[in-house]
Structures are given as C-alpha cells and as structure tokens.
Amino acid sequence: MNARTWGFLALLAMTAVLLGCSSGSSKKAAEDATSSNDVTTSTDTAAQDVTTHPDGLTTDVTTNLDAQDQTSMGSDVKILFLHHSTGGVIWGGGVEQWFTDYNSNQGTSYQIVEQAFPKDAPYGWNNYPFDYWNIWVNHAGPVAFTEEPTLEMLTAKQDVIVWKHCFPVSGIDADNGAPDVTSEQKTVENYKAQYAGLKTKMREFPATRFVVWTGAALTQASNSEESATRARTFFQWVKSEWDEPGDNIFVWDFYELETQGGLYLPDNFAASPDDSHPNDTLAQLAAPLFAQRVVDVIEGRGDTGKITGEP
C-alpha cells in the first residue's frame, strides 16, 4: 500500500470521528433542550405547574408541548364578551378599567364590550353547550336566530369573541351511552358532542380568535358529589383534549380559579353557600387574570401563556 492510499484512509477515519462527535453533540443538545423545557402538557409528557395566589387560591395549569407563539393581531382589536350573571360579576371586578389602563400604558386600542347572550327573550336565559351549538351551528348563517346573532354575524364585526356558561352548566346528569348533539340534557357525552360541533364551526373563521371559559362551578350546597365530579371530568377534557394548539380557539380556566382544584365553588368565593354566583373577592381576583388572558391571545401568546392568565 503506497503513501497516497495510506493518506486517503487516514482522512476517511478522521472524517468518521468528526461526524460521530457532531452527531453526539447534536443529540446531547436536543436532550438538554428537552430536559430544560418548562412547558407542560396533560399527556404522558405532562408535569404540574401549580401556582398559589396571595389569597391562598391554588391552580393547576397545563399547556401543550407543541404550543408556539402566534402572530399578534395588531394594536387595534375589537373584543366581544358574551355572558350572563356570573360573567357580569367578573366584569364588574374591573375588566373594563383594566383594559383602559393597559391601553394607556402600552399604546394599544383593545376595545372590549360585553353583551348578554342569549337574551332572556325571545330565546331564553340559557347559555349552555346546547344553546351555543343550537344558535351557532344548528342555525348558522347570515340571519339571526330568535334575535340572537350567529357567528357569521358576530365575526364580521369582532376580532375576538369570548363566550362562557353560567354555573348551572356544572349540574351534570349521568351519561346514558347515547350522546345526542340535539339534546338539552346536561350530560358529559352530550356536552362533548356539542363542543365538537362548536370547534368545527369556530375554525371556519380563522381571522377571529375565540376565548372559551371553562364552566362556572356550583357550591357544595347546590350540587351532588357525583354531578360535581362529572363537571370536573368535562372541564378537564376541554383543557386537555378539546383545546388544541395552533388554531384560533383558546381557553381561560375560570373553573380552576373558582374551585382551587376541588369540586365546588368554595363558600368564601360565593355570594352565599346556596348562591353560586361569585362574590366580590373572587371578582377582584379573577378580573385582571381574565383580561390578561385575552391580551395574551391577542398578542400571540394564547398557546404558550398560562390558561389562567397568570404571568
């Protein structure tokens, strides 16, 4: 074997060593990045992110590993908050003033308005999964249904739409094994069918971002343990399965803020033990977190920020 051949073989050996080192370094870097990632999910890669508030309220927050920042919607954004009485209490905790202050400090023009939906008449004072599905999916189109605007109408005027359920949503009956999207009966299986239709419908309007509250809880005096457990099961499903990263739908975890990880609205956060409306204490706590969550969604952090609105 001549000198030229020996030199060629030596060059090949050195190249192999260098490639091996490079591959090992890349793999190690990827492993380091994975191990240092502080984003959590509720799947097998999940870890808990528990936050304790000054008032002692504790929340368990999860976000998805596939989450990425999205583009900001800009500085001029119209926001519509659809609600009933529970939402009205939180609104009264200072939501409007929070946005006024934020706009003044940040030079933005985030314009938020609230609206009762659906109204007491002619539709009826019901804002549960069936009712949103009935108005927005079952009666979709450019014409109002019983004087209630469809998504085709709302999205033509609004950049962000926030919707929620009032606390009777947590009074859930047992499943019967036959989910019915057209049923007004409050069961987990019916809720899931209605939420599936709502997700598909909201995704038809990619220029509009939606913020969905996890449902309001009932006090212990107002609900059974079985029903309250079903409520927690459903709202956990909303967070961990129904809500997916990368689309135009986001969740604000009001249920977790209310229940502190339990099954009921605690009496110290309720209007009274047998009145499941939130009190002023909870409203003052929740209002800025709600407002911050909406801003996170507007500014592209909907999939990466905490779903309670905490920093």
Question: Which residues does each PLM region occupy?
Answer:
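Ser/Thr-rich, Pro/Gly/Ala-heavy low-complexity intrinsically disordered linkers and tails
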Residues: 21-68
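Oxyanion-hole/transition-state-stabilizing segment in secreted/luminal serine hydrolases
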Residues: 135-189, 215-220
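Serine-esterase "nucleophile elbow" of acetyl-processing enzymes
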Residues: 64-116
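Bacterial N-terminal signal peptides that target proteins for export
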Residues: 1-10
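Catalytic His-Asp segment of secreted/periplasmic serine-dependent ester chemistry enzymes
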Residues: 218-311
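Bacterial N-terminal signal peptides
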Residues: 9-18
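A short beta-strand-loop structural module common to alpha/beta enzyme folds
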Residues: 103-140
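Structural recognition of the beta-strand scaffold that forms the well-ordered cores
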Residues: 78-82, 88-89, 110-116, 159-165, ...
